[in-house]
């Protein structure tokens, strides 16, 4: 039995996906993906599976464990982990090209992070300045 483990990161969320032969079950933190709320996060997670097609989707079981970040960061981290797992599972370069053509961040990841707050007025944000008055 073949088992593949992959990871995906987005902002501060980290997802670990385990893919194995199965019947098309997808679980996020132990719950079926159908129960993931809000709906936009669920569709984000399912994007790579829809692009891969029913044939691949119904031949594997995917378990994803996600921690850190907010709900959308977690959904995008899970999406990256699932896409990488499917590419590694199939070994198909056409699938990899399809993912990259659809959305490059599905495989590559997004390096943007939040900017750290700077001293003085740091509660307002990293670049906030005191308003200057000339009169």
Curated annotation (Swiss-Prot):
Source organism, top-level taxon: Archaea
Coiled-coil segments on the chain, per record: none
Residue segments, region Disordered: 108-135
Protein name: Small ribosomal subunit protein uS9
Family listed: Belongs to the universal ribosomal protein uS9 family.
Upper classification of the organism: Archaea, Methanobacteriati, Methanobacteriota, Thermococci, Thermococcales
Protein's GO biological process: maturation of SSU-rRNA from tricistronic rRNA transcript (SSU-rRNA, 5.8S rRNA, LSU-rRNA); translation
PANTHER family: RIBOSOMAL PROTEIN S16, RIBOSOMAL PROTEIN S9
Gene3D superfamilies: 3.30.230.10
CC annotations in GO: cytosolic small ribosomal subunit
Presence of the UniProt keyword Magnesium in the record: no
Basic residues composition bias: residue spans: 119-135
Keyword check for Ribonucleoprotein: yes
Single annotated GO MF: structural constituent of ribosome
Record's compositionally biased regions (Basic and acidic residues): 108-118
UniProt keywords, alphabetically: Ribonucleoprotein, Ribosomal protein
């Amino acid at each position: 039995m073949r088992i593949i483990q992959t990871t995906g990161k987005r902002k501060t969320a980290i997802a670990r996906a385990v893919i194995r032969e199965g019947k098309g079950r997808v679980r996020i933190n132990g719950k079926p993906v159908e129960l993931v709320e809000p709906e936009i996060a669920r569709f984000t997670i399912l994007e790579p599976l829809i692009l891969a097609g029913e044939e691949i989707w119904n031949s594997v079981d995917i378990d994803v464990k996600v921690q850190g970040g907010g709900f959308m960061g977690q959904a995008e981290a899970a999406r990256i982990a699932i896409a990488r797992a499917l590419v590694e599972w199939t070994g198909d370069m056409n699938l990899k090209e399809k993912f990259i053509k659809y959305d490059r961040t599905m495989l590559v990841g997004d390096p943007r992070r939040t900017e750290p707050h700077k001293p003085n007025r740091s509660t307002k944000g990293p670049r906030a300045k005191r308003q200057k008055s000339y009169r």
